[in-house]
Amino acid sequence: MEKIPSFQLDHIRLKRGIYVSRKDYIGGEVVTTFDIRMKEPNREPVLGAPELHTIEHLAATYLRNHPLYKDRIVFWGPMGCLTGNYFLMRGNYVSKDILPLMQETFRFIRDFEGEVPGTEPRDCGNCLLHNLPMAKYEAEKYLREVLDVATEENLNYPD
C-alpha cells in the first residue's frame, strides 16, 4: 500500500503550530483540514487523553457556537498520536487565516470555568475521561509559546 500524505510529513522537523494538512474538493466547495499541533512529535511528552478529550469538548462547543464561523465548522477532533487536533472548515483557507480564531478558542479553553459541556453519561461515550485543570494548562501553554508568537515555521509545514 502507498503511504498516505500525512505519514509522508517529516515529523522529526515538525514544530508546534497550525498547518494546512489537506484540502478536499466536495462538489463546488473546499474543505480545509488543519493540523492543530500542540506538541512536537517524538520530542516532548504527548497530551494526556483526559485533557485532550476536554480540549475537544470545549473547542468543538466554542467553534460550533462562534457567531462568525459556526456555519463553516465541519469537525474538531483529537489526533490518535495525542500531539494535537484536526480541525476541518468549509472554505479555502491558509493557516494565517485562522490564527485569530485559534487564539480565541484556546483563550476560551484557558479561561473556562464550570461544567465541561457534554460530559454527562447520556452525552459522551467516555464521560469520566476529562481533566479541565490540565486542559486549561495546555491551552495556556499553547497560547503563550505558540499561538501568540507564531512565525512562518509555526504556520507552514517544513519542506
UniProtKB/Swiss-Prot annotation:
It catalyses: S-(5-deoxy-D-ribos-5-yl)-L-homocysteine = (S)-4,5-dihydroxypentane-2,3-dione + L-homocysteine. GO terms for biological process: quorum sensing. The keyword Iron applies. The keyword Metal-binding applies. SUPFAM superfamilies: LuxS/MPP-like metallohydrolase (SSF63411). Gene3D superfamilies: S-ribosylhomocysteinase (LuxS). It is an enzyme of class 4 (lyase). This is S-ribosylhomocysteine lyase.
